[in-house]
């Protein structure tokens, strides 16, 4: 009843995605298969994406109060071409890590797509995918793993493209989860 199918471009070790088959079964049991599904604390939105891609939900609503995560999901669903261009053109280096960390952490002038890409870059190059964690391999890059160890651009790009194809079936929010649930 658990899944290891991964559809999210973000990495969240220990995330909710493996529970998608269980949620699908609950939806089926309650006669709501094919309806809308809300993931109030989206993060990587693994459950929502799995349900959408396997036809258990016709529309998913992903919500995350974190402005960085929200920017990422808006970039994927509304500006995927720009996001993919950044993904393709940005080298995975420690210099770029510092650049994107600055964009993510500081109140600097950056577009929503740049903020979204900074989220992706940090998620893929930081320990355990934690946005505020340190870089994989350390700043001197002398660890057993290097910062690109979890950043397979081709896999990430493929996932972004698949999600972008379903953009009309995905709504993205940055709201308080309880208020959103009470709408």
Question: For each of these PLM feature ranges, what is it?
Answer:
Residues 2-27, 32, 76-183:
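SAM-dependent nucleic-acid methyltransferase catalytic core
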Residues 33-95:
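Conserved S-adenosyl-L-methionine
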